[in-house]
Amino acid sequence: MATAPARRASSSRSSSEISRTTPSMGFQLGFVDDSNVFEWQVTIIGPPETLYDGGYFNAIMSFPQNYPNSPPTVRFTSEMWHPNVYPDGRVCISIHPPGDDPNGYELASERWTPVHTVESIVLSIISMLSSPNDESPANIEAAKDWREKQDEFKKKVRRAVRKSQEML
């Protein structure tokens, strides 16, 4: 369990990161509830010239008490059809807890270190939207569509983009 000074330092770091982001970076950040600095609302703007272009995808970023020593988790609350997003919305990206990947897909150097920032995490997610990794999918059905049924994959992504626009 983190000590009170460690929680304050973690809270201070994350709060300063929220003030440095702008929509021009492809995302917006805000607190879910002003009394809880450990849960953030993230809106990712679909990357231009991708299937997700035009979408506004909401997610919750939850920080552990010992952040930045452990990574936050990210879960889309908007519909998302992507090989690297679990059906429940949890994001699967390579900056997970430190150490070796139990599946052997990534090097320890590609995994979480405390130098990662909220910005680097969100930019990794934006990059993931542009370039799915179907080698180690979180959503098997989306990965199958991506590999074998591109038209079906595109149709499902377009539906998610439309739904995200309707939620504005």
UniProtKB/Swiss-Prot annotation:
<keyword id="KW-0808">Transferase</keyword>
<dbReference type="GO" id="GO:0061631">
    <property type="term" value="F:ubiquitin conjugating enzyme activity"/>
</dbReference>
<keyword id="KW-0547">Nucleotide-binding</keyword>
<feature type="region of interest" description="Disordered">
    <location>
        <begin position="1"/>
        <end position="21"/>
    </location>
</feature>
<dbReference type="InterPro" id="IPR000608">
    <property type="entry name" value="UBQ-conjugat_E2_core"/>
</dbReference>
<feature type="active site" description="Glycyl thioester intermediate">
    <location>
        <position position="92"/>
    </location>
</feature>
<feature type="domain" description="UBC core">
    <location>
        <begin position="6"/>
        <end position="166"/>
    </location>
</feature>
<keyword id="KW-0833">Ubl conjugation pathway</keyword>
<comment type="pathway">
    <text>Protein modification; protein ubiquitination.</text>
</comment>
<dbReference type="GO" id="GO:0006511">
    <property type="term" value="P:ubiquitin-dependent protein catabolic process"/>
</dbReference>
<dbReference type="GO" id="GO:0000209">
    <property type="term" value="P:protein polyubiquitination"/>
</dbReference>
<comment type="function">
    <text>Catalyzes the covalent attachment of ubiquitin to other proteins so as to signal them for selective protein degradation. Involved in the formation of multiubiquitin chains.</text>
</comment>
<protein>
    <recommendedName>
        <fullName>Ubiquitin-conjugating enzyme E2 7</fullName>
        <ecNumber>2.3.2.23</ecNumber>
    </recommendedName>
</protein>
<dbReference type="GO" id="GO:0005524">
    <property type="term" value="F:ATP binding"/>
</dbReference>
<dbReference type="Pfam" id="PF00179">
    <property type="entry name" value="UQ_con"/>
</dbReference>
<keyword id="KW-0067">ATP-binding</keyword>
<dbReference type="InterPro" id="IPR023313">
    <property type="entry name" value="UBQ-conjugating_AS"/>
</dbReference>
<dbReference type="InterPro" id="IPR050113">
    <property type="entry name" value="Ub_conjugating_enzyme"/>
</dbReference>
<comment type="similarity">
    <text>Belongs to the ubiquitin-conjugating enzyme family.</text>
</comment>
<dbReference type="InterPro" id="IPR016135">
    <property type="entry name" value="UBQ-conjugating_enzyme/RWD"/>
</dbReference>
